[in-house]
């Protein structure tokens, strides 16, 4: 070890000690060879793995992180995220379109700017919301938002549960009109009204009929502070997932209710890192069935 630094020697001794705490060059060499062999086995990107990756990305639109996390959690052989990203980049360079099925298409996107919204009268502030909601440990607390179509025409309602990340979506027949939105929300959630304790929204005038929502669904409706999208971070993130299927500047006239249900299913069927790679739909229906 004459040419090695003291720190290198220390690491070598620490990594390759025997069970008795002593260092043996022979044992160290055997451990090193075993470690290399294990690394080679783990890193080999087999044909079966590639088929699995292609399926999850192209058919289910799972992220690389979701694929790796789900496979490791369920004992399915898989390589690391870096290897999969290299595979996607290589596919793109070879004229493939696998990257088009990833959420950001290998590009970093900047956050959208938020426009000023009208004041909603007699609303309950998020500051009045029970503390347990912010802890995100109790089932039954939801965030609501709208995704707006091209030219500010048409709207899709999104409602997501905080603990399971279960998403419900609906294309609104009359866009952002408050009465129509309330009608659609009540109709969509009526079968699950016993599992909705609170809903938190932004200050958009489209939620001004919240009192009727509270009465019909027997819940409490709260509003975040103006220009504070981080108070509804789950909605913001979930809308980003929806945008993978419905990009900005999409004309909503071309989107069918069947397609909305299909996108909803796919998002709820993705394993999520925040859920320890469980799927939202599995966790949600464990609670309600």
Each model region followed by its residue ranges:
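Short, basic alpha-helical/linker "hinge" immediately adjacent to a nucleic-acid-recognition surface
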Residues: 1-60, 65, 70, 76
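Mobile genetic element proteins and their domesticated derivatives, centered on retroelements
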Residues: 9-12, 53, 67, 84, ...
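Basic, flexible linker segments flanking DNA-binding modules
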Residues: 25-34, 77-134
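Charged alpha-helix within mobile-element recombinases
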Residues: 47-60, 190, 211-221, 225-289
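Two-metal-ion RNase H-like nuclease active-site motif
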Residues: 139-149
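Short conserved beta-strand segments at catalytic cores or DNA/RNA-binding microdomains
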Residues: 147, 151-169
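Active-site beta-loop-alpha junctions of metal-dependent nucleic acid enzymes
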Residues: 150-152, 169-193
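Acidic/histidine-rich, metal-coordinating catalytic segments
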Residues: 194-209, 227
């Amino acid at each position: 070890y004459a040419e090695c630094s003291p720190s290198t020697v220390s690491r070598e001794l620490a990594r390759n000690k025997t069970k008795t705490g002593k260092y043996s060059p022979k044992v160290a060499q055997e451990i090193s060879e075993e470690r290399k062999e294990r690394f080679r086995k783990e890193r080999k990107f087999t044909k079966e793995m590639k088929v699995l990756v292609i399926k999850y990305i192209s058919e289910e639109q799972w992220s690389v992180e979701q694929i790796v996390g789900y496979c490791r959690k369920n004992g399915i052989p898989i390589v690391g995220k870096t290897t999969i990203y290299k595979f996607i980049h290589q596919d793109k360079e070879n004229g493939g379109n696998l990257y088009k099925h990833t959420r950001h298409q290998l590009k970093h996107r900047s956050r959208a700017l938020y426009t000023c919204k009208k004041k909603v009268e007699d609303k309950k502030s998020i500051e009045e919301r029970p503390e347990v909601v912010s802890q995100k440990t109790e089932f039954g607390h939801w965030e609501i938002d709208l995704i707006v179509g091209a030219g500010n025409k048409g709207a899709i309602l999104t409602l997501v549960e905080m603990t399971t990340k279960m998403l419900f979506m609906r294309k609104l027949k009359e866009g952002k009109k408050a009465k129509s939105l309330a009608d659609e929300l009540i109709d969509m959630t009526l079968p699950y009204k016993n599992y909705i304790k609170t809903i938190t929204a932004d200050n958009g005038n489209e939620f001004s009929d919240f009192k009727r929502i509270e009465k019909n669904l027997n819940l409490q409706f709260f509003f975040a502070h103006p220009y504070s999208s981080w108070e509804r971070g789950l909605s913001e993130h979930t809308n980003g997932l929806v945008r993978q299927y419905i990009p900005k500047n999409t004309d909503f006239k071309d989107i069918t209710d069947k397609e909305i249900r299909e996108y909803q299913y796919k998002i709820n069927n993705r394993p999520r890192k925040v859920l320890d790679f469980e799927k939202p739909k599995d966790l949600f229906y464990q609670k309600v069935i």
